[in-house]
């Protein structure tokens, strides 16, 4: 897995220098994002399918898809440059468990996707994200949002749903009524 993460890092630096795909501009920044993406493996339940909303340059989906190679990942990203990059990464890393779609969550038919885990990183307010993505989550599925310290201003959440590592707050919650 390390060799593939190193190749992903190389590709992101190469493409990023031309296309401005991410705020990560060097190996250290990308390694930090990789570790941030994988930190959740310490507390999330096993899953068979994941919908990553607003995949951007591939965090957290690419590192997670490498670590959880038996799970199926669907990446939603509306930006054409980022989608082209994600397709390039998929081919270069031979990620057969990845499906990439160029679209926004608002344009996906709820009948077309049903997953165990929904991930998103720095996309939108947690309450809005739950409202948009809940139709795609299986009954016993989980939301996993990579957020900052402002999470509790976005949504009422129990302490066991908030995992804090440094400045990052991971919101991990089973499907429930968030009203």
Curated annotation (Swiss-Prot):
GO molecular function annotations of the record: rRNA (guanine-N7-)-methyltransferase activity
Reaction catalysis annotation: guanosine(527) in 16S rRNA + S-adenosyl-L-methionine = N(7)-methylguanosine(527) in 16S rRNA + S-adenosyl-L-homocysteine
Name by which UniProt lists this protein: Ribosomal RNA small subunit methyltransferase G
GO CC field: cytosol
Gene: rsmG
A Pfam family recorded for this sequence: GidB
HAMAP family: 16SrRNA_methyltr_G
InterPro entries hit by this protein: rRNA_ssu_MeTfrase_G, SAM-dependent_MTases_sf
Enzyme Commission number(s) of this protein: 2.1.1.170
Keyword terms of this UniProt record: Cytoplasm, Methyltransferase, rRNA processing, S-adenosyl-L-methionine, Transferase
Record's subcellular location: Cytoplasm
């Amino acid at each position: 897995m390390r060799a593939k993460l190193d190749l992903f890092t190389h590709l992101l630096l190469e493409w990023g220098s031309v296309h401005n795909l991410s705020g990560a501009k060097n190996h250290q920044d990308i390694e930090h994002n990789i570790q941030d993406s994988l930190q959740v493996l310490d507390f999330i339940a096993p899953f068979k399918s994941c919908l990553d909303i607003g995949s951007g340059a591939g965090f957290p989906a690419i590192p997670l898809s490498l670590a959880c190679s038996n799970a199926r990942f669907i990446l939603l990203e509306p930006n054409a440059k980022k989608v082209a990059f994600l397709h390039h990464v998929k081919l270069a890393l031979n990620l057969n468990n990845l499906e990439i779609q160029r679209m926004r969550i608002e344009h996906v038919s709820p009948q077309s996707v049903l997953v165990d885990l929904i991930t998103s990183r720095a996309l939108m307010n947690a309450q809005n994200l739950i409202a948009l993505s809940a139709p795609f989550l299986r009954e016993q599925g989980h939301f996993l949002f990579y957020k900052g310290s402002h999470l509790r201003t976005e949504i009422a959440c129990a302490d066991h749903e908030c995992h804090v590592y440094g400045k990052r707050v991971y919101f991990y919650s089973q499907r429930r009524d968030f009203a």
